[in-house]
Amino acid sequence: MTSFDALLVAGFGGPESMAEVPDFLQRVSGGHIPPDRLAEVEHHYARFGGVSPVNAQHRALAAALGEALVARGIDVPIANANRHSMPYMDQALADLQSRGIRRVLTLVPTPYASYSGCRAYREELLAGTRIDDEGRPALQVVKLDPYADLPALVTAQVQLLRAALADHPDAHLVFTTHSIPTAMAETSGPHGNAYIPQHLALIDAVMAELAALGLRPSWELAYQSRSGSPRTPWLEPDINDVITRLAGEGVRDVICSPIGFLTDHMEVVWDLDTEAAATAAEHSMAFTRVATVGTLPVFIEGLADLIVAALSTKPGTGPDAPAARHWCTPDCCPNARIAGRPTIPGFAAGPR
């Protein structure tokens, strides 16, 4: 018996043909990204036939989680939804409602706290939930809290890096994550400034496990994929600037680990595999991009355990309920454009 009737895997979304690219970019930009930047990104998609890898990888993630849950004796419907491409949030929620679903647990494949990576999904999930005849949401929808502290995420990263370091033992390790506006980073999490520390805590745990294996590469954190107005401060340094600096310091081999992404996005296959790799080549540096954790079995098993704990916990109860954990509060990760926009609640699945 579970406290939820379905699991929704809600992602950013991406186009799956060139015909979908213009509408997708307009939805993403919302009029806040300069036209020249949009044209540049459209060119990136054209290089890949207009197809982002992210939707297929999120479908694979959902399928792998479904198998892992069934192996644990839990068989609930699992659906996919996206913020910026089909199936949209409201479509997926309406479909679940039509199937008699009433309580939905949502997993967003972004483990860190920020407006763009957490609250924006909570806002859109509420906006996409139909209202019944009595003026109440027809579905009870909650979103699993950020899970950057999931031990399986550390183990998966160590597994990937151990293999890369075996081939490149003298490489300098650069962890990357999505740059966000500095103001967004400063207001991330219930008490602010959670975004960067969550990454650093994950890196510290990864490096400790690598050290236990006798691997002690030098490392740093860099950012990638900034967009928006150039007048708005975003997190730095950029991965390409880091590579250029490292070349000047005599570094000849770089391993890039995109810990900010659980699956491949266009930001991974273009910004890293294409642009960052080209920057390294310009400086005659070896460049290795570590895979995203995706459906790596050790990660799926750990994530499935977290979801089982959530599916088995009644919302609002238990020693680690949202109110007790003080995470994903109504005011955290605020919307800088629409103050106070309502959201669905976050949901804590128990101590990890």
UniProtKB/Swiss-Prot annotation:
One cellular component term from this protein's GO annotations in UniProt: cytoplasm
Main location: cytoplasm
Cell location: Cytoplasm
Family matches, as Pfam families: Ferrochelatase
EC number(s) from the headed UniProt entry: 4.99.1.9
Summary of the function given for this chain in its UniProt record: Involved in coproporphyrin-dependent heme b biosynthesis. Catalyzes the insertion of ferrous iron into coproporphyrin III to form Fe-coproporphyrin III.
Enzyme class: lyase
InterPro entries: Ferrochelatase, Ferrochelatase_AS, Ferrochelatase_C, Ferrochelatase_N
Catalytic activity: Fe-coproporphyrin III + 2 H(+) = coproporphyrin III + Fe(2+)
Key word Iron present: yes
This protein's encoding gene: cpfC
A molecular function (GO) term: ferrochelatase activity
UniProt entry keywords in alphabetical sequence: Cytoplasm, Heme biosynthesis, Iron, Lyase, Metal-binding, Porphyrin biosynthesis
Binding site for Fe-coproporphyrin III: S52, Y121
Pathway membership: Porphyrin-containing compound metabolism; protoheme biosynthesis
Name recorded for this polypeptide: Coproporphyrin III ferrochelatase
Similarity-based family: Belongs to the ferrochelatase family.
GO biological process entries: heme biosynthetic process
Annotated positions binding Fe(2+): H178, E267
